[in-house]
Amino acid sequence: MRNGVLRLAGVLAAFTLLSLAVPLPYVEELRTEAEAAQSSACDKNPKPANLNFVLKDAAGKDFNLASQKGKVILLDFWATWCPPCKVEIPWFVEFQEKYGPKGLIVIGVSVDDPASALKPFGEKYKVNYPLLVGDGRNDIKGPRGYNAAWGLPRTFVIGRDGNICKTHVGLSVKEHFEQQIKSLL
């Protein structure tokens, strides 16, 4: 039995050494190309963003998305119960603070939370950008809107020209967001 264990250990060691023989520069080059493609400013065929709607904020005031055209918009569809959303929100707070004066606006649209849940959530996370109520709005949740009901968070990076440059579904990489924002400002 001892010889069998030693043989198995030898085979595993040989396999490990062979797997390290893959040229690391080649693997690194592939990783770098993938990251560059992911973080480029806009997709090849950007589509116009639908900014022609008005949502209520946590205080019940109207917020007209069309009034933000001409800015770089980070439009984030999220929910208070969504763990990946809670990871990204502090990044968005940082982006709003850092890039807001340069023409960025972050807009958070809660897809299934009542207005009463937004204010305490915003205070807890020190949100410095508009939090809007999207609950019950099929025009933004459905396929004719932003498909915000399918996968959260769902974040759109929209250029000054009103075109959707990138769409992120699920937890994304902070650096990708930041690179895209910087390239559009």
Q: Where are the predicted features?
A:
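N-terminal targeting signals for export/organelle localization
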Residues: 1-56
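A short beta-strand-turn-helix
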Residues: 52-73, 96-99, 143
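Conserved hydrophobic/aromatic "anchor" residues
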Residues: 53, 68, 77-78, 121, ...
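Short pre-active-site segment immediately N-terminal to redox-active cysteine/selenocysteine motifs
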Residues: 71-73, 77-81, 88, 151
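Rossmann-like NAD(H)/NADP(H) cofactor-binding core
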Residues: 75, 105-107, 130
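Active-site-proximal beta-strand/loop segments in catalytic clefts of secreted hydrolases
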Residues: 77-78, 109-112, 134-135, 169-171
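Structural microenvironment flanking redox-active thiols in thiol-disulfide oxidoreductases
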Residues: 86-126, 136-143
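Thiol/disulfide oxidoreductase modules built on the thioredoxin-like
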Residues: 123-128, 134-182
